[in-house]
């Protein structure tokens, strides 16, 4: 969530004419992230987030916006898109699609503990099940076809050793994706980017017995229909990792995965290919971070992520595959 497209006070005043949200009290850009232009918007009616979509088209956007509405209606805490005066959920700002959504309660937890991982695991499983009857389909746009396109553009900027790893893992994942086992894995709408900065936590009520409460998941604009296990792997690779080495923290990983499977038990096929999917989750973000680092787009507040972080994670997952916690598996 960076700022690629500037919005002046005059721009905002014209845009807000299409909403019944009262008067603007405060408006500022959000400097984190790398994909869209995002702004905190406070009005006399409440707190919101304005997003200008830098890459998604108006034809692609309904999948994401409608998915958030669908999940919210099924009790999953996500930002709710705000309707414009004509009933639509997004419009056009500076020639690009744009939308306003409600702002979730809480703050990001950048040093998550066991309790945070339990909350995330349970809600991720609930989100997957809630999306089963979502009628629209949009593939994960940062999956194998995109990797195949991006890798040749990255190769000139990296070392021979990195190239060997990048191309070798691409071949491994291509074979995995082509397998009957992969085709049989459960699938549906996935967040595909559920990092620790894409969830918020608030203080739990005193009578709950918990110290934290999940405020919700946000930034669904990398979402797509994919294998649920991929979504779990992406989440574990961020929430349950030692940031200095890339190794999994066994306690946090076990907590998140056990919490997930209390809601949706893993299948036998998912257990068999957990290691492959952990590698896929690491590879996806190594490729995208290499691409964004070496082939950046102009942005007023862009802060590119370190590609080396996910290179370390990928090497760790290749060396230490790990296993899902033991419990009864579905077929």
UniProtKB/Swiss-Prot annotation:
Pathway: Amino-acid biosynthesis; L-threonine biosynthesis; L-threonine from L-aspartate: step 4/5. GO terms for molecular function: ATP binding; homoserine kinase activity. Its EC number is 2.7.1.39. It is an enzyme of class 2 (transferase). It catalyses: L-homoserine + ATP = O-phospho-L-homoserine + ADP + H(+). Belongs to the pseudomonas-type ThrB family. This is Homoserine kinase. GO terms for biological process: threonine biosynthetic process. The lineage of its organism: Bacteria, Pseudomonadati, Pseudomonadota, Betaproteobacteria, Burkholderiales. It comes from Burkholderia thailandensis (strain ATCC 700388 / DSM 13276 / CCUG 48851 / CIP 106301 / E264). Keywords: Amino-acid biosynthesis, ATP-binding, Kinase, Nucleotide-binding, Threonine biosynthesis, Transferase. HAMAP family: Homoser_kinase_2.
